[in-house]
């Protein structure tokens, strides 16, 4: 059975040690910088565990990388990946975000079944209000921007690496059954009802866009995450 495939895109402007630290922090794996594919990476939550292959690539000029990625030669990769984690550090964060948004809209088939994370690797973080507005606009694409250097706050939702892990945790790995952990044993569970899941997700997106109050929107998202998690497990 094939492993799930996740593409990680890193800017060449990051130091090698930052590449290693990023991947090791998210995936709890000792990453060898000479690897372009890290196979058989275990992802475990309270409810399930699965196995990932990490496809690791770098870019100098993002648009040039995108031009290659949308070519016919890369169609198979575009089709099989379960998600993309895109790291960027540009002081003007809007052009790279727009570039990836257009990629998702125009060239990723069935993007609602995949996850897309933009990790802003810059200590001058995107301000909370702007980040909220940005992610509201990207919700339809299953694309979320996360500040890597956001400071955790007990009163806030998860941020930084913990938020990235949370997004991966609740992703519905739809291509094959997962392993559910129960007590000391393990049992197999069937794939979720994809139609019901996607209908609920689309309804949630439409409702989310009607909120004007950020706190109400955050509470709604927490509720939906719990409900979708229940559907997965």
Swiss-Prot record:
Gene3D superfamilies: 3.40.50.11960. It comes from the Eukaryota. Disulfide bonds: none annotated. GO terms for biological process: vesicle-mediated transport. The keyword RNA-binding does not apply. InterPro entries: Irc6. One of its GO terms (molecular function) is protein-macromolecule adaptor activity. This is Increased recombination centers protein 6. It comes from Kluyveromyces lactis (strain ATCC 8585 / CBS 2359 / DSM 70799 / NBRC 1267 / NRRL Y-1140 / WM37). The gene is IRC6.
